[in-house]
Regions:
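Glycine-/charge-enriched secondary-structure boundary and capping motifs
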Residues: 1-99
Length: 99
């Protein structure tokens, strides 16, 4: 995840008729991002729009493959978390909701 942070990059990989719901507490925000938020007085929305907040890559995986994918990533030494879900939600089409 690069420029555009989580909010602007995730919609690029999902169809327009779907939305993404991210659980902000599903991973630990690295200390550098806590520092940036505090020292820069940056609100959460702007943090997620500007930075990856410690999420370097996102894999969109079918529910049936989540456990297998997490096991594989852990086995090869990667930190991995389920951070959200893709939803068929007309109210939030093509958007990312982080809460």
């Amino acid at each position: 995840i690069t420029g555009g942070g989580l909010i602007e990059n995730i919609p690029r990989v999902i169809p327009d008729d779907l939305a993404v719901k991210i659980e902000a507490n599903s991973w630990k925000l690295p200390p550098i991002f806590e520092w940036l938020r505090e020292k820069g007085n940056v609100d959460s929305y702007e943090m997620y729009k500007t930075f990856n907040c410690g999420v370097g890559i996102i894999l969109c995986v079918d529910n049936d493959n989540v456990s297998k994918t997490l096991s594989y990533l852990t086995d090869i030494g990667e930190d991995a978390w389920v951070i959200g879900q893709i939803k068929d939600d007309n109210k939030f089409n093509g958007s990312v909701d982080i809460s």
